[in-house]
Amino acid sequence: MRRAKIVCTLGPATDGYDRTKALVDAGMDIARFNLSHGTHAEHEERYQQVRKASDETGHSVGLLADLQGPKIRLGRFTEGPVLLERGDTFTLTVEPGAEGDRHQCGTTYPGLADDVTPGERVLVDDGKVCLQVTGIDGPRIHTTVVEGGIVSDHKGLNLPGVAVSVPALSDKDEADLRWALRTGFDIVALSFVRSGRDIDDVHRIMDEEGRRLPVIAKIEKPQAVDALDDIVAAFDGIMVARGDLGVEMPLEQVPIVQKRAITLARRNAKPVIVATQMLDSMIDHSRPTRAEASDVANAVIDGTDAVMLSGETSVGKYPVETVRTMAKIVEAAEEDVLAHGLPPLTEHNKPRTQGGAVARAAAEIGDFLGARFLVAFTQSGDTARRLSRYRSPIPLLAFTPEPATRSQLNLTWGVETFLGPHADSTDAMVDQVDELLLRYGRCRKGDTVVITAGSPPGVSGSTNLVRVHHIGEDDTPH
């Protein structure tokens, strides 16, 4: 059983029900909808295809709506892409409606002229083109091309070291968020997060719509790295988005940030995704490079909950093969990690709450007894996430009456989720475990499982109970 989850970005290469179902069969756990591209109608069709494929295969798939965020972009070039050569002069302008040519182009960010100063760099298209600011004349930012290349419509701009004053949510993001909430998505990701306070507007809109979802903070700005503790505390999970992060800060720092982010998220029992260019060469080739295989494996060894595919699945030539390849790499890395048994407690992972201590006790009891499964009964997913963070080699099953929780736990390491009725007592929990695990052939009579839950049942965040149970046997104390 693979423990780390796979997030796949949907796009033109995955369109059509048969392709979507093939992704699910190959191992997709979370379908990511990149709302920077496409229309609501296109995304709605993909949404329906994923839900149908999930129902038909019986493989739960969570749906993640990834908001564009305050991404600064170029405007439109009147006559198509333009080649900028080293030493050329090029002007960025915030004048409304400015058309682009080989001498100038507009930008989506009206405050650009106020935020940059001469000498600073402006990077275009993830750093492929580098401009240096030479002067500012009202709404016009004059630059010299330091590294040339082709620029075209709506390419992204990065301003390394510049604290831009854009809001956390654009008007487009608000419209996309409301659409995602009404459509029925399971998880939301917020781009270009800079502080824990950035979640406030998202929660305000969710409350207006009457639906709170987990919000994942994308770590892709130096300000986010500086505020990582604050962000992990405020958000429901994080994504290490290495594309923009590697443009905004020195490349050699990105692996260090990745390891720190994974450690911090695990300490707080929050899911963490490692993303961007994991199997990038498979956009065009049927096999990854050795370095890419090592990258995926090392993210798993570091302890990430999930690894993500972007262009590899959304526009690549081999989307299904890429998912299969990633699954094989993950499983091979985990075979080595899990062979070491239950990881010992350290200063970084020791429990700091009652729920965390109870979850650790369940993991250790399971280890001592050679349990077949650890079982978490959970309303919100909290109990399962607390158990997951200890990375026990014993498979972890979550039982929940909430369909949304089932989908959301697809992002958490090692959790396989069963949907069942609300259990109003510990005896009802035991009966449900016996029935489902025997029905699906997951256990034999007499197998040991360790159950953890909250008592009274149904109270979110109240993990306080551990029970050792032998499948199919009445082990209630008399």
Where do the PLM segments sit?
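Non-catalytic helical/linker scaffolds that mediate oligomerization, partner binding
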Residues: M1-H478
